[in-house]
């Protein structure tokens, strides 16, 4: 319970997460189908990616 909150706020956990986000974004642009890739990426990163995806785009 408490491990989930600090884990998302921890900057150390965000480092590897950001790298994966870039991977998702790159795959989305290469594949074109943003909706399909976005769904897969969001499922892998939960809502964290959905919140950063629109911000990066």
From Swiss-Prot:
Residues 1-57 are annotated as: Disordered. Residues 23-57 have a biased composition (Polar residues). Induction: Expressed in the late phase of the viral replicative cycle. It comes from the Viruses. This is Uncharacterized protein L57L. It comes from African swine fever virus (strain Badajoz 1971 Vero-adapted) (Ba71V). The lineage of its organism: Viruses, Varidnaviria, Bamfordvirae, Nucleocytoviricota, Pokkesviricetes. The gene is L57L.
């Amino acid at each position: 319970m408490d491990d989930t909150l600090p884990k998302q706020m921890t900057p150390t956990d965000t480092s590897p997460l950001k790298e994966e986000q870039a991977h998702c974004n790159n795959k989305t642009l290469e594949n074109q189908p943003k909706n399909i890739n976005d769904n897969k990426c969001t499922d892998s990163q939960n809502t964290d990616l959905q919140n950063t995806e629109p911000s990066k785009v």
